[in-house]
Amino acid sequence: MDEVCAAPAPKKMVAKSLVLNTFRKASVKEVVELKKPWKKVLWRKQDYPDNFIDESFLNGLQRNVNIQVTDFWSLVADSLPVSQHLSSVVIFASVFVSIYRNQLSCALVGFVSNVSAVAAFILWDFVLRKPCNNRTFPNYMGIVKSCILIVLTLAGLSPILMSLTKSTSPDSVWAIAVWLFLANVFFHEYTTETIRPHVRLHNSLSTNAALSASVVLASRLEKSINVFFFILFAVHWFALFPIFRKYIHVFSFYADMLMTLVLIISAYIALNAVASVVIAFVFLSLIFFISFICPIWFIKLQRFKNEIHGPWDIALPKLGPSKG
């Protein structure tokens, strides 16, 4: 039997199918071209699915735009206020221990504190406040009245403060003082870029905590005159001396560094006298860690910073003088 072979399709049918396929492809292409370009907006209904991601979606992505790379010595300079305040707390605690052990005269502490406060005020008035753009003329009469009021108030309250913790065990007094000093260190304002005339909440909490700790410690002294001089020293040390340190920091880096070294050395000598060499060495190690190891650590961690910005972020208003 002869093999049956399929007859070839007519030429007209082949041409017709080619025309139809070409028309379909052209129609699909026209439909795609008729779509409007995708825009990165949510409020407009577009001819694209909700999960559509255009190739231009991340064109506006920016990484680490606002990061400021700081050098080592700038970070060391920024760590000086921390070292200064820690040294100040250590010096104050060492002075109290020396007075409590009758190794140091409280009257001598009060005299040195008053003389230092007057000298610091003269230095601030004639030297420090001018480079800091502090053009306000100080009210000397008001300052004198405030000083007299503080002295008279402390003199009147000293007998009362002396008997404040008579019924409290010494261990409880030391524990309360330690916690208050920790609050002082934690809430202290270490930013010194500008001298702000207003008082911040956390800075006032720090000062109040230190003065409260001073009152608690002063209540363990035996004479009311010692309580008076010790609290007066605390007012100078925790209320006025931090302000003076800020002006020194703004005035000169070298003066700030010199004052930091003096405070650290004084704190080391004081700890060595009232405690031991081991505790003094631990304090120096802590200061070294804060001043040198932490800046290096911070610089190393900056390379892991990944902050992204783009046109999808919330617009920030640009405030300035109005035109016209």
UniProtKB/Swiss-Prot annotation:
Lumenal side: 101-107, 162-171, 245-250, 300-324
Family per record: Belongs to the PIGC family.
Keyword Endoplasmic reticulum set for record: yes
Membrane topology: Multi-pass membrane protein
Cytoplasmic side: 1-79, 129-140, 193-223, 272-276
Chief location of this protein within or outside the cell: endoplasmic reticulum
Localization terms from the record: Endoplasmic reticulum membrane
Key word Transferase present: yes
Entry EC no(s): 2.4.1.198
Pathway named in the protein's UniProt entry: Glycolipid biosynthesis; glycosylphosphatidylinositol-anchor biosynthesis
MF term (GO), any: phosphatidylinositol N-acetylglucosaminyltransferase activity
Gene symbol of the encoding locus: gpi2
GO biological process terms held by the UniProt record: GPI anchor biosynthetic process
Keyword vocabulary terms for this entry: Endoplasmic reticulum, Glycosyltransferase, GPI-anchor biosynthesis, Membrane, Transferase, Transmembrane, Transmembrane helix
Organism the protein comes from: Schizosaccharomyces pombe (strain 972 / ATCC 24843) (Fission yeast)
Catalytic activity: a 1,2-diacyl-sn-glycero-3-phospho-(1D-myo-inositol) + UDP-N-acetyl-alpha-D-glucosamine = a 6-(N-acetyl-alpha-D-glucosaminyl)-1-(1,2-diacyl-sn-glycero-3-phospho)-1D-myo-inositol + UDP + H(+)
GO CC terms: endoplasmic reticulum; glycosylphosphatidylinositol-N-acetylglucosaminyltransferase (GPI-GnT) complex
Function: Part of the complex catalyzing the transfer of N-acetylglucosamine from UDP-N-acetylglucosamine to phosphatidylinositol, the first step of GPI biosynthesis.
Protein name: Phosphatidylinositol N-acetylglucosaminyltransferase GPI2 subunit
Transmembrane regions listed in the UniProt entry: 80-100, 108-128, 141-161, 172-192, 224-244, 251-271, 277-299
